[in-house]
């Protein structure tokens, strides 16, 4: 029986074409105009290049095997790639101290016609201090606050100084050893102060898995977050989520803190969330969709590096500069940076900005990671 040919919409019918040159895909985002009715307003802290923001907003492409619910799909782009629907979330404020992070964020989010003025190139400490001096820094009527507060001081790949970080809130090395709330390791406290100010219905904070094994750091952070706005937030037990269990071909694990405003909850939800064991129908943590290490055969298979990289031509055959540029350092033997290839048939390692992973090593330029 001949294989059925799927007819995808011709790109000529779209007025706002966006290209993804690595995969020879062309698509548009449909109607980019904001629908204010029913919109959930998001204040983003430590925004970086926008990973958490984009995850909430939707409207991006991903591999077909990563999507387990057809209702999430706006349009099938080809046999392997889909464009996801936009969600109800809208980013109304973002910030970071790195100019290159802001540039990347604006470069991508501009396709959603986001006002570039909402991204503030400032430290969260300085923003809170300006608010305390009477400036109207933060927006009103915020529904969700998100933030991946700096992880270097909690990571097993770093010096693990935790709260005693030797780096300031602006990313600069400190010359003194005096206790301070303005170090990189204590910036979650300033996130808590933003929550005090804007009083969102919910907040989501993220950090590396290594935080869980660093003494009682996890419990301290959970308790501090719980005290926001006069103890008005239920902060659920933080959970470590593995990206491979959600259709991402990467061995990335992150601890997630979720806080929900008590006064925003209905009575039955408040009662359920205050239980030691939260009923599944009220638990906000996502259930795994793919079986990387949960051992549930009813779930979808893990998405592999082959799935997402298999369509790419070899670097020497590519016309895309971001793919052609990679480290050509001399082979120095096993165990050194960049000498081990990723597992093509499995999940890739977490890639740090130093061009290598926490466990495995991979010689690639940062440009290539933008795929």
Regions found by a protein language model. Name each.
Residues 1-89, 224-228, 253-371:
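S-adenosyl-L-methionine-dependent DNA methyltransferase catalytic core
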Residues 9-199, 209-215, 219:
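Core alpha/beta nucleotide-donor-binding catalytic domains of modification enzymes
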Residues 127-142, 152, 156-348:
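Class I S-adenosyl-L-methionine
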């Amino acid at each position: 029986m001949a294989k059925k040919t799927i007819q995808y919409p011709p790109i000529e019918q779209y007025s706002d074409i966006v290209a993804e040159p690595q995969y020879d895909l062309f698509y548009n985002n449909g109607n980019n105009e904001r629908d204010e009715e029913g919109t959930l307003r998001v204040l983003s802290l430590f925004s970086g290049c926008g990973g958490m923001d984009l995850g909430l907003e939707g409207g991006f492409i991903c591999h077909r095997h990563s999507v387990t619910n057809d209702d999430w799909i706006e349009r099938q782009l080809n046999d392997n790639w889909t464009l996801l629907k936009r969600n109800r979330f809208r980013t109304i404020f973002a910030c970071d101290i790195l100019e290159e992070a802001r540039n990347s964020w604006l470069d991508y989010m501009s396709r959603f016609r986001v006002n570039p003025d909402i991204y503030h190139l400032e430290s969260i400490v300085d923003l809170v201090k300006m608010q305390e001096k009477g400036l109207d820094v933060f927006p009103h009527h915020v529904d969700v606050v998100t933030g991946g507060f700096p992880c270097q001081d909690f990571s097993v790949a770093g010096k693990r100084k935790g709260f005693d970080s030797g780096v300031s809130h602006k990313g600069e090395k400190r010359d003194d050893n005096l206790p301070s709330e303005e170090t990189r390791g204590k910036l979650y406290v300033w996130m808590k102060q933003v929550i005090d100010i804007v009083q969102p219905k919910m907040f989501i904070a993220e950090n590396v898995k290594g935080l869980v094994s660093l003494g009682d750091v996890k419990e301290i952070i959970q308790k501090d977050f719980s005290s926001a706005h006069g103890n008005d937030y239920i902060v659920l037990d933080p959970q470590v989520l593995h990206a491979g269990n959600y259709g991402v071909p990467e061995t990335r694990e992150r601890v997630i803190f979720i806080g929900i405003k008590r006064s925003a909850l209905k009575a039955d939800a408040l009662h359920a969330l205050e239980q030691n064991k939260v009923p599944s129908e009220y638990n906000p943590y996502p259930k795994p969709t793919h079986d990387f290490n949960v051992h549930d055969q009813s779930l979808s298979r893990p998405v592999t590096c082959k799935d997402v990289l298999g369509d790419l031509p070899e670097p020497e055959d590519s016309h895309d500069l971001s793919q052609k540029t990679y480290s050509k350092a001399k082979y120095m033997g096993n165990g050194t940076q960049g000498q081990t290839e990723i597992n093509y048939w499995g999940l890739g390692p977490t890639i740090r900005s130093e061009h290598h992973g926490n466990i495995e090593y991979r010689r690639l330029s940062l440009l290539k990671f933008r795929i």
